Each structure stands twice: as structure tokens, then as C-alpha cells.
């Protein structure tokens, strides 16, 4: 309780400051409606930023607006979040940062329960604290105000439900993850394959409960989307997102950054070509990225199928898949490695070396995120300046170094998955 309280206080303190006002304004426009916002002429361009999420999060944002209006909470919900309105908008900024903060706390509770299930309650508490104060987790949710840590919490919940044989929770949390962000594809195929692989031994007789959990979440989100007018996002959130940020890398320090970054100057977005361009007139960069991700995913599933240490190897497989998604696919944003960082930190529950690698990858991800969301922190200008050091780099060296670390996380996790040993055909974890 003390740990959760301290983590919550720190998060709300960070949330009070600027964050990414552009993304928060977009969330606000989805929730309120551009035509209902003040300064309509100044914000009508946001109509071009139609919701490109599945229905869960935009519906939740609109629900937050209704709660704010009904409860007469502080702040003008219709005043656009902007630099000029920053002081007046702080209560609204806090409002839109509350979901990721709540998700972080929930994920920590799940990690602690997972540790207790593994008969490692002390280590579970330590890993939960490690997760809560992980730089990338803190920065992406509480400061930036983005949704990646919400997705991460749902995926960790799905992994916990799988490992502890809770079919209703597994179906429910996996469905919520899919309805939150299309980027859930970074991990959900691993969990789906795991269910199929252990179908006869474990999940066949629990299919009704698994289906019930998924159905409950789906119908709840469907009802919420209908209530909030977001039903069209069942299409927009999945079928309009590919190509919207058509570059090989969109601030993501990954394999594509290394390939296309200039070596004689600081790189910028214009250096990264559209991923729809064809290589040698045959296939597009996007096709190559998807093929590489599919190959890495298939390799990970094949290896996990024979892994001996099922709880630990499942987490490593999820981490490997998430790192493959971030490093190999095109159109990646800087924060899409947050899911990979979370599972890397979680792996410390079984092997303590992941404390070091989890911290390293969390720091590189946080630094990567500052490319898009600079740290603004008036209480300590020294911290603000040094956390933004990456922005002042004139040469490509620091960018390439961080890219290399993040790319190398994939073979590192795959190697650890290989070292978990092999088993026979009998599942390592019996059904309970």
C-alpha cells in the first residue's frame, strides 16, 4: 500500500507538468468534439486527426468528459489544452493522464500477485517497485500522457491469467488489449499460440470460460462505444492506421533508424523514406518489415513450444515478440518499445540479470521518447536540461548508439529464451 501510494503521488506530481500537449489536445478533441470546444477556429484543424484508435480509449475519454461535467470538477473541459492555456488546463491534463496512472498501479499489483503465485512474494514486491519506478513507464504514462502503459498493463494481466490458469481473466484482458490499440499485435499472437499449443492439456475444457471473458469485454466495449458514439472506430482503429505515418521510422531508434540515418550530421524525419517505396522495384519497406516481424514471431513461438520453464519463458517470448515488433516493423513511434520494456522488467521475477537489462532498456526508451516529448520541469531546471541532453546532440553518434542498444535487446531476449532448456511433449505447468 505504501509503495502504491508513493508511486501514485510521484505520478500525479509528474502529471501536473506539461506532457505532450499536442497528443493531449487530440484526446480532448475526440472526447469533447471539436465543434464543442472553445476557440473553434483555432482547433478545427483537429478534425483531420480523426480517431485512429479502436473504440475503447476514445470512448473512455468521452466518459471522462461526462464525469467531469456531471461532477463539476475543476477546469474548463472545453478550453483547448495549449501552451497559452497551460495554467487553466492543468486539471484537464490531470484528468486525461489518470487512466495510464491507474493502469500502472494495477500492473504493479498484478506483478506482485504473480510473484506470490510463484512463491516469491518478496521478489514480486521488488519487481513491482522496479516496474513502478522504471523511467520509461513513468515518462510514457504519467508525464507524456500516452496509452502504451495501459496496453502494457492489460498484456501483463493476460500473461498472468495464462500462467495462473484463469480463463475468464485471460479472455477478458486479451480482448480489452485488442480493443485498446492495434499495437496489441506485438504480444497477443504469443498468447494465442500458447493457448493453441496447450489446448488439449489445459484450455479445451476451459474454452467456455475463456470465451465468456472475451465476450464480456467485447460486449461491454461495444455498449460503451454505442453510448459514446464511437462505433465507427471498430473500422477506423484497425483499417486506417497503416500508412498514416508512412515512414520507415517515426522517431523510433530501431533497425530502420540505423539503416537510414545519415552518418555526417544529426538525423531528422526527412531522412527516413516512406515505407511504401519499393526496394529494387519488388517489395516495399513495409512488406520487408512485416516479413521480418512474422519470421521473428514464428521463431519465438517455435522456441517457446519446446521451452522447459514455462512461466519465465512465456514472459521472455512476449518480450522477444515486442522487441521484434518495435525494431523490425516500419512506421514505429518512439514510445512503441514501452511494452517490450515492461516485459523485460517483468523477467526479473525469474532471473535477476533482467534488473540490469530492464533498467538499461527503460533508460534508452525514455531518452528516445524525449525526441517527441521534451521534459519540461520548472521545479528543477538542472534535471530538465540534463534529461533533454539528447535534443542537443549535433552528431548521429548518440542516436545510433541508443538504436544499437534497442536493436540488440531482441537477440539478447531470444538467447535467454533459448537457454530456458527443452521439455518433452508434456506441458511443464499442469492444469489446476
Predicted regions and their residues:
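Perimembrane helix-loop-helix junctions
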Residues: 187-216, 226-227, 339
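Extracytosolic helix-loop segments that constitute the early lumenal/periplasmic catalytic or substrate-binding loops
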Residues: 25-59, 63-81, 230-237
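Transmembrane signal-anchor helices characteristic of membrane glycosylation enzymes that use polyprenol
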Residues: 1-29, 37-46, 133, 213-230
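Transmembrane-helix motifs of polytopic, lipid-linked glycan transferases
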Residues: 83-86, 90-119, 157, 295-303
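Transmembrane helical bundles and short interhelical boundary loops of multi-pass, membrane-embedded
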Residues: 223, 227-250, 302, 318, ...
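Aromatic/glycine/proline-enriched transmembrane-helix motif characteristic
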Residues: 11-12, 117, 241-327
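Specific aromatic-rich, kink-prone transmembrane helix
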Residues: 110-113, 134-137, 150-169, 343-344
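Membrane-interface transmembrane helices that cradle and orient dolichyl/undecaprenyl
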Residues: 116-122, 156-169, 199-201, 307-309
Amino acid at each position: 500500500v505504501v509503495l502504491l501510494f508513493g508511486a501514485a503521488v510521484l505520478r500525479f506530481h509528474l502529471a501536473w507538468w506539461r506532457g505532450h500537449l499536442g497528443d493531449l489536445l487530440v484526446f480532448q478533441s475526440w472526447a469533447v468534439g471539436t465543434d464543442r470546444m472553445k476557440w473553434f477556429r483555432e482547433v478545427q484543424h483537429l478534425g483531420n486527426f480523426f480517431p485512429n484508435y479502436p473504440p475503447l480509449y476514445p470512448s473512455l475519454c468521452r466518459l471522462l468528459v461526462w464525469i467531469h461535467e456531471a461532477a463539476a470538477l475543476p477546469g474548463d473541459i472545453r478550453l483547448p489544452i495549449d501552451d497559452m492555456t497551460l495554467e487553466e488546463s492543468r486539471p484537464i491534463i490531470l484528468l486525461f493522464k489518470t487512466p495510464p496512472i491507474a493502469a500502472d498501479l494495477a500492473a504493479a499489483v498484478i506483478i506482485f500477485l504473480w510473484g506470490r503465485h510463484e512463491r516469491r512474494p518478496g521478489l514480486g514486491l521488488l519487481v513491482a517497485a522496479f516496474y513502478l519506478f522504471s523511467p520509461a513507464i513513468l515518462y510514457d504514462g504519467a508525464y507524456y500522457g500516452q496509452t502504451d502503459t495501459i496496453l502494457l498493463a492489460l498484456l501483463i494481466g493476460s500473461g498472468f491469467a495464462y500462467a495462473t490458469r484463469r480463463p475468464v481473466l485471460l479472455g477478458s484482458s486479451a480482448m480489452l488489449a485488442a480493443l485498446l490499440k492495434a499495437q496489441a499485435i506485438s504480444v497477443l499472437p504469443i498468447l494465442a499460440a500458447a493457448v493453441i499449443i496447450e489446448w488439449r492439456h489445459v484450455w479445451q475444457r476451459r474454452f467456455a470460460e475463456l470465451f465468456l471473458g472475451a465476450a464480456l469485454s467485447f460486449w461491454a466495449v461495444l455498449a460503451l462505444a454505442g453510448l459514446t458514439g464511437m462505433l465507427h472506430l471498430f473500422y477506423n482503429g484497425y483499417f486506417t492506421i497503416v500508412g498514416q505515418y508512412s515512414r520507415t521510422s517515426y522517431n523510433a531508434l530501431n533497425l530502420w533508424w540505423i539503416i537510414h540515418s545519415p552518418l555526417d550530421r544529426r538525423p531528422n524525419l526527412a531522412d527516413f523514406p516512406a515505407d511504401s517505396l519499393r526496394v529494387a522495384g519488388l517489395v516495399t519497406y513495409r512488406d520487408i518489415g512485416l516479413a521480418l516481424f512474422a519470421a521473428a514471431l514464428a521463431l519465438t513461438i517455435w522456441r517457446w513450444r519446446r521451452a522447459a520453464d514455462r512461466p519465465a519463458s512465456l514472459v521472455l517470448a512476449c518480450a522477444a515478440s515486442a522487441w521484434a515488433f518495435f525494431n523490425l516493423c516500419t512506421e514505429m513511434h518512439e514510445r512503441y518499445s514501452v511494452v517490450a520494456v515492461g516485459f523485460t522488467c517483468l523477467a526479473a521475477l525469474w532471473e535477476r540479470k533482467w534488473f540490469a537489462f530492464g533498467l538499461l532498456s527503460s533508460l534508452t526508451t525514455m531518452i528516445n521518447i524525449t525526441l517527441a516529448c521534451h521534459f519540461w520541469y520548472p521545479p528543477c531546471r538542472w534535471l530538465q536540461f540534463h534529461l533533454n541532453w539528447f535534443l542537443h546532440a549535433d552528431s548521429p553518434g548518440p542516436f545510433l548508439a541508443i538504436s544499437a542498444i534497442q536493436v540488440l535487446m531482441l537477440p539478447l531476449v531470444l538467447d535467454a529464451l533459448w537457454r530456458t532448456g527443452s521439455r518433452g511433449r508434456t506441458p511443464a505447468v499442469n492444469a489446476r
